[in-house]
């Protein structure tokens, strides 16, 4: 804010989410349940801020390609070159500005698919690892979320690669993606591109995000740490993201995300000391809004105790019946109308009436952080491709994380055993708390 003539500053790039225009109000402040910094936060911290409309959206030309490294990725590299030559940017060298990236969702994915070595640090929020896995996990298409995304793109007048619409149509109508559609989604990375990421990376992912759930950030972090570069990686799980936090929100959640983001940029972009050293390696908020930290990421050896929380059940008969007594949609006058109206209401997992239930009674004080493992044996006859697994918090009646896990089944009359990792959760057991595992016929 307020550079004098001849002064220079480090640069932060802030691409927007899908269906959103670049932010142009320099005084915009961070709101509740926010996953990142606002323009005012960045400028007040002493950074030049660059925002833009991604290709195919709003004032930009071209055709939207879903953060493809050969299209949107090259656009970002061109912006970095422009920042070096045409703005009052501090430089590391010729055509190499001191630059970091912040932003969420579509604006988080592009940070990992650009893979420009000039980028000094990234803070991808509520982003994906694999669009195929995120949008069609276990070959079960997320029809509600596809509808939300399609309406956002159409409402914004986006000009889109027609193969993307084709995939949405076949997914919605037939729960099927062609090889072409899968290839288009695969081209949006980051997956294999993560092997090239050297920029220090701080992930911010939502515990109640049913579009890009926690496992997407976990996979990204694992991939970057497997590189030989020694890249610093830290992670925050907050109550928010795609969807809505129905649980209590810690009053310091947003301010922590903002201060951590600025500290990350200060350390790795501006080079003003090492405030990022004080950021916990892993921090998360549980279902009651309580803040926790760890020196280990949730997938690293030593994070979990050797003896896990376990529960077993005797099973029963489950009918796979579309629409009736399944998981979702979200209902209730206590919630904002925007999340209880079609199609957003359909994106929430809820306690189901048609379900097999297994009691889970962990010890008070236990923390269940990560992906529960589920295994069961079944047989059946029918045309269904999957059942759904979810954990219900008996204290609130809500599904932990608002999220269910599709479990692929083969209903050929023979006995099968299936084992899956459920959606990651962050749950602390208090006095009187318990869970119910539900195996649900429809979500």
Give short role names for the model-derived ranges.
Residues 2-8, 63-72, 78-105:
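Gly/Ser-rich "nucleophile elbow"/oxyanion-hole loop immediately N-terminal to the catalytic nucleophile
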Residues 224-244:
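Catalytic histidine neighborhood in serine/cysteine hydrolases
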Residues 252-443:
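C-terminal, loop-rich substrate-recognition/catalytic regions characterized by aromatic stacking residues
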Residues 197, 203-205, 209:
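Short beta-strand/loop motif that positions the catalytic acidic residue
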Residues 1-47, 52-55, 67, 104-105:
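N-terminal cap/lid subdomain of alpha/beta-hydrolase-fold enzymes
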